[in-house]
Amino acid sequence: IRILDNSYISNTQFISLAEEVAEKCGVKYQESVRRGGSTNAAKISVTGKAVPCLVLGVPSRYAHSHYNFCAKEDLEAASAMAANVIRALDEEKIRHICHQDVL
């Protein structure tokens, strides 16, 4: 779970939800703070209706090369995390994450 990178500070409510879901479902995760690099989350979070984003990353070696290596278990955990967080979202949780009464 990316907490912060070069261009985006993650929504703390979304992070809390992801951590709750991971604990409940037994999905292993780590928190990450990056001083360099970024994702599209910064742009997405301020586009249109300012959509909160949750950045899930997979630890890997030789990123952005032809030989990017990662553990199969980490890919499976990231997929499980994403699927379970999506399943956990309902209107009430989305409002809580967005801090607004009407979507």
Where are these predicted regions, by residue range?
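Active-site-adjacent substrate-binding region
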Residues: 1-76, 85-89, 93-103
